Amino acid sequence: MAPLQLAFVNFTKGSYIIVEGKRNADRFFIIRQGNVRLSKGVQIVAEEQGDTLGPGDFFGVVSTMSGHSHIETAQALSDVTLISVQKEQFSQLIQSNAPVAMKIILQFSKRVRYLDEALTRLTLKSNAVEDPSHIFNVAEYYAKQNQYNLAFFAYHNYIKYCPQGENAGLAKERMKKIAPFIKNLKLDHNPNEMLRTYAKNSMIFCEGEPGDELYIIQKGAVKIAKVVDNNEVLLAVLKSGDIFGEMALLESKPRAAGAIAYEDCQLMAVNRENFKQMIQSQPQLIARLTTLLAERIWLIYKQLANTQINDPLGRMYDALQIQLEKKKVDISNTVTFMFDFGPKELSNMVGLAESDGRMVVRKMMENRNFQVVNDKIFVKDVKEVGRQTAYFMKMQQLEKARKEKSSTVNYF
């Protein structure tokens, strides 16, 4: 393999290096000298690392690795010298400079967790709970849903991680009560066994429990969900080749969400020791993990901006557009599209109660371009999603401008 050759680029003070919304993200930058300021059109939450970057910091990685439009604008605060890294050079960068690659991955992981907590607060009006004691609440939820295998697994893990917990005795009683209904449940796997199989509706891990492994899906599908205020919130359905569980491994923090086999599946489990070895031996895997984290960050930023749309119908149209952009569907073309979720999940995405969501969906269905087919949302022309989203965004901007103007009127 040829040695890694990175280019140095210079920008004068005041220059715009990347611009939010532009779809030209084919490289990211590491600051060698000088300072750069990041800004966003819609600033929902303050970034943990701040908006001023210096030598050793990097920017543009999210959009470059995810293949989406830029989510921020970068402007030189002084004359700057930057190291330019093209997307296809990232695997080489991992092999030649593992510390830089790990810095990117660790920062991304922290960023995902931080932004996900902010999104939970804004959409679900609740704080995320990342503590083993929460496992009991998860177990109680699934028991009430008559999903006894999931409940038994969660009760078992609550006792495992909180043996002296205030609900330990109650958890044991619950386990005895539902034991007759348990079918083909496997509670533990050999930690030395990298390839593992899980039957449909089996719990792989529970939110709130410690985690020291990430998983790569070899076959099947996995549902990522969390229980908030006695409701299950679907976060994602992952397919073959996807990676999950990496944040707990990288940060040594409790699982932020639970993982359940959506279909019969086979997973490869990677522990910390194996992960360190893979950084050098399998740079493509680390590049894939970086891409995955970048896609999550991009998606959460879009979802955070969605929370600022006042009209619930506008939020729904925007949520559909986000999903189309996520799948890289060109909404400038007249094509049909079947979403892999229905009205209930769409209401959940925009933080509406099921009853409120049904009313808004009925209003959406008055537009003949939209239908519900086999409990999935179907659109006859994806351009209509873009048109409706643009309309509601324009109305939002006009309303904001009107309020700002009225607040600055001077009365004599």
Regions found by a protein language model. Give the residues of each.
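Charged, long alpha-helical assembly modules
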Residues: 166-214, 226-227, 232, 237, ...
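TPR-adjacent "capping" and linker segments in tetratricopeptide-repeat scaffold/adaptor proteins
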Residues: 117-134, 187-188
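Short, structured interface segments
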Residues: 93, 98-120, 165-182, 286-296
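Short, Lys/Arg-enriched, Trp-marked, Pro/Gly-tolerant hinge/linker segments that flank
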Residues: 121-127, 300-312, 330-333
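Alpha-helix N-cap/N′ positions at the starts of helices
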Residues: 9-12, 85, 127-137, 196-199, ...
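Phosphate-/nucleic-acid-contacting segments
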Residues: 131-178, 312, 319, 325-412
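Regulatory nucleotide-sensing modules
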Residues: 1-41, 178-231, 240
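Cyclic-nucleotide recognition modules
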Residues: 48-105, 236-290, 298
